[in-house]
Regions:
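Long hydrophobic segments that form regular secondary structure
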Residues: 297-319
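Terminal intrinsically disordered/low-complexity segments used for targeting and assembly
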Residues: 1-64, 112, 122-124, 244-290
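Transmembrane beta-barrel architecture of outer-membrane proteins
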Residues: 55-57, 78, 135-137, 183, ...
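Periplasmic alpha-helical coiled-coil/stalk elements that build and connect Gram-negative outer-membrane
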Residues: 15, 161, 168-284
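Membrane-embedded segments
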Residues: 74, 78-81
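Small/polar (Gly/Ser/Thr/Ala-rich) solvent-exposed segments
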Residues: 70, 93-113, 125-132, 137, ...
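Metallo-beta-lactamase
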Residues: 243, 293-294, 300
Length: 332
């Protein structure tokens, strides 16, 4: 009885801890406005959303040359290789071994003396051990682990989920790259428009300053008014210099995103840009959350983590491994 009790205690101690897998949280079926509209916002690709042909060309260049985006593409290849490896765990491991060796026995060694005593005249010539001794071998073996606890299947599921997560992460990187490029491009157009406005303001300020200076000569204005308009001219000139500096920074930022140096940033005019249509879809924008690549990537990572937990629990159980081997061995 004491032995049985100790065995039960040992079995209870080897039991893996129970993990709660239920993370469901009750959420309201609709928002505060009570919208039950099932209309889904159709996602638009970037080449449809952006009507500017120059911006489209920049996006194409960025997707080909941006270093960060190319790294994310390589991570997809790494995840795909890990998935292929996980699939291979469910298949038998087959090995083919072909070997050849040459051994020369020393005259005053145990092997040398033993072989000289073994090669007696009464032994057939083809059974004598030669010196040097050439050995040849050919063998075939296989080993297969039965997936009785689902450990290997869960590993494959985790690898597949991580591959999908890397795909979604790459889509997220693409979305961020395109949005950053579009923001820099449109801000650059805005700076061009600001430069045009400042130039017009500078011309107007210079005319006002000259007019005030002439009026002062006639005694109709004071030196204070002349100095005020001159200060206005200097202020606008400083803003123009600052604006030119910002334009240079934006151009360098776009070139950095494109991965091409140096690069002349051609852009559309502000008035031309205003005439371009903006394609929009009808529906509830909140529904697009289900299509966000960062959300889907996090969901895939959660699925992979759950599969890893189940595989780790199954690793505590005994494994069933089947194997066999056979081959030929001879010497000359």
């Amino acid at each position: 009885m004491i032995g049985c009790a100790l065995a039960l205690i040992a079995l209870a101690g080897c039991k893996t801890p129970e993990l709660s897998m239920d993370e469901r949280i009750s959420l309201p079926e609709s928002g505060e406005m009570g919208m039950n509209d099932t209309t889904f916002v159709k996602p638009l690709s970037w080449d449809v959303f952006f009507q500017d042909t120059l911006l489209r060309g920049y996006v194409d260049v960025a997707l080909r040359n941006n270093h960060s985006f190319r790294q994310s593409m390589e991570r997809i290849a790494m995840s795909r290789a890990a998935l292929q490896r996980a699939k291979g765990l469910l298949l038998p491991d087959v090995n083919l071994n072909i070997g050849a060796s040459v051994n020369r026995f020393g005259e005053y060694t145990m092997d040398g003396v033993g072989n000289s005593e073994t090669n007696v005249p009464s032994l057939p010539k083809d059974k004598h051990i030669p010196d040097p001794y050439r050995d040849f071998g050919l063998s075939l073996s296989f080993q297969w682990e039965a997936d009785i606890w689902g450990k290997l299947t869960r590993k494959k599921q985790a690898a597949a989920a991580r591959w999908m997560a890397s795909v979604e992460a790459t889509r997220f990187a693409q979305s961020m790259l395109i949005s950053d490029l579009a923001i820099q491009y449109y801000e650059l157009i805005g700076l061009d428009r600001r430069k045009e406005v400042l130039r017009n303001a500078l011309a107007s300020a210079r005319r006002s300053h000259e007019l005030t200076r002439q009026l002062k000569k006639e005694g109709a204005e004071t030196q204070l008014a002349v100095d005020q308009f001159y200060a206005r001219v200097l202020s606008i000139e400083s803003k123009l210099l600052e604006n030119d500096q910002l334009i240079g920074e934006k151009e360098r930022a776009i070139a950095c995103l494109l991965g091409v140096f140096p690069f002349e940033i051609r852009r559309m005019g502000f008035d031309e840009l205003r005439k371009l249509p903006v394609p929009l879809s009808e529906g509830i924008p909140a529904n697009l959350l289900t299509l966000r690549p960062d959300v889907r990537s996090a969901e895939m990572e959660l699925i992979a983590s759950k599969a890893d937990v189940i595989a780790a629990k199954a690793a505590f159980y005994p494994s069933l491994v089947l194997g066999a081997s056979g081959g030929f061995n001879a010497f000359d």
